[in-house]
Amino acid sequence: MTLEIFEYLEKYDYEQVVFCQDKESGLKAIIAIHDTTLGPALGGTRMWTYDSEEAAIEDALRLAKGMTYKNAAAGLNLGGAKTVIIGDPRKDKSEAMFRALGRYIQGLNGRYITAEDVGTTVDDMDIIHEETDFVTGISPSFGSSGNPSPVTAYGVYRGMKAAAKEAFGTDNLEGKVIAVQGVGNVAYHLCKHLHAEGAKLIVTDINKEAVQRAVEEFGASAVEPNEIYGVECDIYAPCALGATVNDETIPQLKAKVIAGSANNQLKEDRHGDIIHEMGIVYAPDYVINAGGVINVADELYGYNRERALKRVESIYDTIAKVIEISKRDGIATYVAADRLAEERIASLKNSRSTYLRNGHDIISRR
């Protein structure tokens, strides 16, 4: 598609797009700020080999809007934004590049706070931190929360229990058969919680070592990647690639609940409508996997793990609220999640509007 930038920004109510260029380091980046009604915009920095500049802009805009909804639904006083860097993260990175980006972020004076994302690391965030305080997910020695995977997993576990309560009348997962697609960092910690509660696990992953670890530690059964959709199970937990709920997989599903850590689980919105009509309880991805962003957001107030985990625990209540809206309004849960986020933003729109205050009033609480 041909991107008419201002027409697009107006249509979806974006506030700002910043183009960042540094000739010496080769930095080419886009910072997209979607909405700051709730507070400064928080969203990660992604580095990717985009096919075109237009594709990079579109990705930044799409991801920024997604962060607005994720942060709002999570109850955070933060808006949504995203940075994308055009380049190959395996060979194009340099200290100069990330320091240049840090200066651009500093120039926004706290309207935008970044974190790591696909293609970037904690080390990259540490370099950005040399130029600005408006970055989270840095090394623990700087007061960071460290690896977010265990906290994200705990949030998914809590959200899964809320979805199970709706589907089975109880949130007790003991004896429930749960098919976990992908056994990476987040899913491994999710499996720990599920195994501890007495759930029976079926796992798959293209990484055979990860599968073997789950088999040995949790007594899981292993299947091939293309077999996971059709297994007899109570809950399907997509924790790897996105778009796994689609025309090909839906007819195979035997689960009554879909709840996992993967992003963009529905290939298209209509797939959310289809599973809703089938009576499958779907825990919307950006609500159930918000533990990571809740965790890093806590760094802005001086990281307290107990406080962060308590907030992540409330993902149970958020999923329950989404299900309540779904039933009340007769809509699919993915629509209900959007409605929950939009209602929260709208309730504060008149009183707060665009965030233009000096960001140090938040970041200084570290």
From Swiss-Prot:
This is Leucine dehydrogenase. Its EC number is 1.4.1.9. Pathway: Amino-acid degradation; L-leucine degradation; 4-methyl-2-oxopentanoate from L-leucine (dehydrogenase route): step 1/1. PANTHER family: LEUCINE DEHYDROGENASE (PTHR42722), VALINE DEHYDROGENASE (PTHR42722:SF1). It comes from the Bacteria. The keyword Translocase does not apply. One of its GO terms (biological process) is L-leucine catabolic process. The gene is ldh. Gene3D superfamilies: Leucine Dehydrogenase, chain A, domain 1 (3.40.50.10860), NAD(P)-binding Rossmann-like Domain (3.40.50.720). SUPFAM superfamilies: Aminoacid dehydrogenase-like, N-terminal domain, NAD(P)-binding Rossmann-fold domains. The keyword Oxidoreductase applies. Catalyzes the reversible deamination of L-leucine to 4-methyl-2-oxopentanoate. Pfam families: ELFV_dehydrog, ELFV_dehydrog_N. The active site is at K82. One of its GO terms (molecular function) is L-leucine dehydrogenase activity.
